[in-house]
């Protein structure tokens, strides 16, 4: 074998980074594989935009078939994103006996089971290190160095846009809308930021991490997802008063034959390592029965870090090919017959501490009515703050509860919000402060 040819479908930001890395560090890569890795063909609908890279004549095409049907191409890199035509391209590559490397967390979070099964039948790899955490080597660690562990929890700050916004709100006391506008101007947020700020991107990623850690199949549609657009500077300030920071946290937990998988704003202690993950950085924390707690930290997006992760997967495939191996490891790290069936715990059944903020008239008996409704639903109060006394006007009342069941808390808030003393819908934020 004189070289290993790869084909790229999708020549956007990450695709450009992959091409640059192969061309820039080709000699280094060859010294670690044994033969050169050659980028033979790039398919994209736009082949006229100047991407700041010089490519050989004839490498670019608008026809993905030139990648998928080329018998010399052993590895297809899918970087177009989304569900279709990405899914069709990936399945066709597999059917043609080609290994697949992708950064498409949305595709795998929804259609992973079908894709993994197809790869198993054809004895080819599907690798996706770049789908979670950009350049942070978290997936290879789960499948490799930590494979002997039973995992109990996985927690992650997995979206740089949300983390940047919450960091600025925390440090400057700024409002959500103002920071979002700045993030868009700096290129940290898309013109339509819904995918990021409503937690969808993070939910795709935690679906993959939970599947990998717990050896089960979790799809995006099963993840409880709540974004950060409702977080106000008022909540940020009260969190600080209680010794917490607010982060968009992805949470996965296993309890016997049940699993939790959820994404939502979460208060975590300000002295906790995850609370110090600021700006556009990501972090993922695992707890294994033998390795204990382990945290990975780094840039979770961007051309260079993500391209680095893609090339890491390509090198892994290339080394297997040099050793005469087709598929060395199933995508989730478990033998196909060893995947567990775990039941997803509904959000109403989780137990947590809660931050509750009420906007109520400042008059005698208000706190008694609120605490009475909470007690009726088996919710006990740990601490309270009331600020801005103004008789006859509405003021914020903030309570921190002891651990309670979510459906009980929701029922209590539904009742309290009917009180004539309440002027705005009550606010709930979950607290994670007892992490293994």
Task: Place the predicted regions along the sequence by residue.
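N-terminal glycine-/serine-/threonine-rich beta1-alpha1-beta2 phosphate-ribose binding loop
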Residues: 1-96
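Rossmann-fold NAD(P)-binding glycine/threonine-rich loop
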Residues: 86-96, 105-143
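Rossmann-like NAD(P)H-binding beta-loop-alpha module
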Residues: 120-201, 208
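Substrate-binding/catalytic subdomain of NAD(P)-dependent oxidoreductase enzymes
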Residues: 179-276, 280-283, 302
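Low-complexity, glycine/alanine/valine/leucine- and proline-rich hydrophobic stretches
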Residues: 264-289, 303-304, 375-391
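A conserved regulatory-domain signal marking ACT and ACT-like small-molecule sensing domains
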Residues: 309, 314, 318-436
